[in-house]
Amino acid sequence: MSVARTAGFALASAAIVAGHGYVTGIVADGTYYGGYLVNQYPYSNDPPAVVGWAEDATDLGFVDGSGYTSGDIICHKDATNAQASATVAAGGTVELQWTEWPESHHGPVIDYIASCNGDCTTVDKTTLEWVKISESGLVDGSSAPGTWASDNLISNNNSWTVTIPSSLAAGGYVLRHEIIALHSAGNENGAQNYPQCVNLEVTGGGSASPSGTVGTELYTPTDPGILVNIYTSLDSYTIPGPALWDGASSSGGNSGSGSASSSAAATSTPTTPSVSVPVIPTASSGASSTPLVPTPSAPAVTPSVPAGNQAPQPTYTSTYIETETLPGQTVTSTTTEYASEPTQPAVETQVAQPSETEAATSTSTVTETASATAAPTGSSGSSSGSGSSSTELPTDSSSLSDYFSSLSAEEFLNLLKETLKWLVTDKVHARSLH
């Protein structure tokens, strides 16, 4: 493979990260606890004991309607008990921190809790009875596909806060937190469930010990909130699952409700700006041979770990291809995840579907982003990538190819190292806990 082509693949892989997500950690009553890092821990011989349930969704995939009667719907694919618990007082809050959630994956955010009736590290997940304590669905359906709870989660720095009911009896519980993506839900088994579970030790509280619903009976593939076309204007939306427990503290952790309503919070914009990086899509099975031209992406927001509570540095890299069919259009994206320390998350960029005009000019992919990548530098925090050590790249694709071909192996490796350092190490967003 030529140096130019190798460079193209390397830059594309570094710029695109996994399209779905998972909970990296939680903050319970102000204390941070690490979650299960599915992009690293499955490949470790001795993963740490964390509050998040272990699972095997290493492709960052989902559970669809065909899995609603299997154990996978409970806490995700092949989930096993967490070996630690987070302490939270009844009436307290739990903030769940996600990796960047894709904007196209609109849908409700739902929280359940189930008593372990003993040791949560050994409880049989199929016996857990889930009680819904929080739900948020369609916020504004006046313009398809609408504004959803998932959009509020994104605007809140990819996090969601749920209140533990104050009347709940003290003891060991499993919190089941879930996003249901509805972008393909117009077809049966098209909805995508992303359940995440964490162990809690609830203190104080009252005497309430409500009975619930076992995980394999929460949903059916034809439930009104599961089989739904979000690409038509919706006046209302029925959040799937059992009814909200009357002892729950609220109807939604980050605002929004089961029916459509206007909400200023729904249109709030994250304060952390995105970083432009070159995106050079590669040909894949089922995808058009015409390269996709990247369009300006939404602000990227990434979770962080408070100082002094850092999880081990992940080292695993995974790549997968996803093809999704929307009404009248097909979108194929190639995604690669680069894991790093929770305090230094990889820069994430989403490749949007090109318009007809963009497709006509798709051969100038690198040109459109060259000004943002005019060579990565070692200066931290610079969004332009300029500096005394920068090397200006050519501004047209043919010249760029010639430029890469002219590099020696050592020069190319140095350029690649600088690019990856700029993408992964220097471009860091931090978030303070409040």
UniProtKB/Swiss-Prot annotation:
* GO cellular component entries: extracellular region
Which top-rank group of organisms is this from? Eukaryota
- Intrachain disulfide bonds: C75-C197, C116-C120
Biased composition (Polar residues) is annotated at 328-354
User: For bias kind Low complexity, which ranges apply?
Assistant: 249-292, 298-307, 355-401
Q: Which GO terms describe its molecular function?
A: metal ion binding; monooxygenase activity
Induction info reads: Expression is significantly induced by pectin. Expression is also moderately induced by cellulose. The degenerate binding motif 5'-SYGGRG-3' that binds to creA involved in carbon catabolite repression is present in the promoter.
Q: Where does Cu(2+) bind?
A: H20, H105, Y194
Q: What is its EC number?
A: 1.14.99.56
Known Pfam families for this protein?
A: AA9
State its cofactor. Answer: Cu(2+)
* Residue positions binding O2: H183, Q192
Q: Where in the cell is it found?
A: Secreted
Which UniProt keywords are given for this protein, alphabetically ordered?
A: Carbohydrate metabolism, Cellulose degradation, Copper, Disulfide bond, Glycoprotein, Metal-binding, Monooxygenase, Oxidoreductase, Polysaccharide degradation, Secreted, Signal
In biotech or industrial settings, the protein's use is given as:
Lignocellulose is the most abundant polymeric composite on Earth and is a recalcitrant but promising renewable substrate for industrial biotechnology applications. Together with cellobiose dehydrogenases (CDHs) an enzymatic system capable of oxidative cellulose cleavage is formed, which increases the efficiency of cellulases and put LPMOs at focus of biofuel research.
Membrane-traversing stretches: none
Any binding details for the cofactor? Answer: Binds 1 copper ion per subunit.
Where is the region Disordered?
A: 249-315, 328-401
Provide the catalytic activity annotation.
[(1->4)-beta-D-glucosyl]n+m + reduced acceptor + O2 = 4-dehydro-beta-D-glucosyl-[(1->4)-beta-D-glucosyl]n-1 + [(1->4)-beta-D-glucosyl]m + acceptor + H2O
Q: What class of enzyme is it?
A: oxidoreductase
Carbohydrate-modified residues are: N157
GO BP, one annotated term? cellulose catabolic process
Q: Which family does it belong to?
A: Belongs to the polysaccharide monooxygenase AA9 family.
Function in brief: Lytic polysaccharide monooxygenase (LPMO) that depolymerizes crystalline and amorphous polysaccharides via the oxidation of scissile alpha- or beta-(1-4)-glycosidic bonds, yielding C1 or C4 oxidation products. Catalysis by LPMOs requires the reduction of the active-site copper from Cu(II) to Cu(I) by a reducing agent and H(2)O(2) or O(2) as a cosubstrate.
Q: What is this protein called?
A: AA9 family lytic polysaccharide monooxygenase H
Species this protein is from? Emericella nidulans (strain FGSC A4 / ATCC 38163 / CBS 112.46 / NRRL 194 / M139) (Aspergillus nidulans)
